[in-house]
């Protein structure tokens, strides 16, 4: 029999002692009183973690092996490791993951225990990063990747850019890159980064596109040549329409090529067609787990068929179904949306039941399951994502599609040996938007 204190349980679960006390009072965690203090049976804590799909909250730790691969790469804001898996599939091994979110850290440590693990980017320095990754001072860091929190730049949010704490970690990431000096610096972010307003001078007025200009100016001052574009992941073999900016900086000042597409919806490019939700879902076997639509919304989903949305409801039901959103401007195409079987899935979001970005199964009266999320993002079947249902949706919904990460890795590896496989695709429509690349993007 092993008894644990409240502080020991908090450390195991990665939560505060106050939270341990609260869930104990709520009857979630069994305990005994010893003197004036609560004590916990280790077996009860292990059972709680099993029930809640948790692992012991990992502490920061160095890489577990000493050998150094030919290519050295480190990852920040690693999340559930979508970008990292893609890079590794391309042949870019990730030696270190840095992530601050407790559930994501559990996911990382469960699936990639031998890699180094660090936390908050604000507290990291170049020596600690190199020491934990076991990259000696005489050896270059070949690739540094990161997808800094995108909420500060998202078109769906207030877009406070660098005035938001999450935006400030973006700036710290750039400072850390300047200290580490990787040969290749990869930044992944949302489309909103192209247009987020920010002052170009202290005390100045916000300028449309100012956030991206600030980043580009910073990279230029570091001596990096920069290429970027907005990429639809469906063009790289992902069964999902997800558009993300990929910025690639090169320390030698030259410009990296754009990614090389592998799929297209247009036969003119002689590439395989976009992959579909049906293809992704066909790989699923066994029980599926999903949240539920509220009954008051479910009744309207039952009126809709595959590929339909709120405008396909009976006229007399549309205003009732939409409520206040009925009078909003814009297409509102995500409301009451049933996805198509034979098209790529729309962008996965952190919850499939958010009204403006509904993700309803084509024929069943339910949201997409976490197994369908996993299949659409192309995570390996044996990949364990820690936490409850909400946590798993969030981690998978925030992840970079693995196919897109693989395209990034292949582009970098080819560029290292002087090969540009994107030349035949100079005019390829990488996304549905115009003026989104380092050649065509301009501030108004």
Spell out what each predicted region is.
Residues 224-235:
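Conserved S-adenosyl-L-methionine
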Residues 131-134, 241-248:
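Short, surface-exposed amphipathic charged segments that create phosphate/polyanion-binding patches used
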Residues 202-226:
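Conserved Class I S-adenosyl-L-methionine
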Residues 25-33:
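Short, solvent-exposed alpha-helical "recognition" segments
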Residues 53-184, 190-208:
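Core alpha/beta nucleotide-donor-binding catalytic domains of modification enzymes
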Residues 7, 12-18, 22-26, 38, ...:
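S-adenosyl-L-methionine-dependent DNA methyltransferase catalytic core
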Residues 84-85, 151-155, 193-196, 237-241, ...:
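Short catalytic/ligand-binding loop motif for oxyanion handling, primarily in non-cytosolic enzymes
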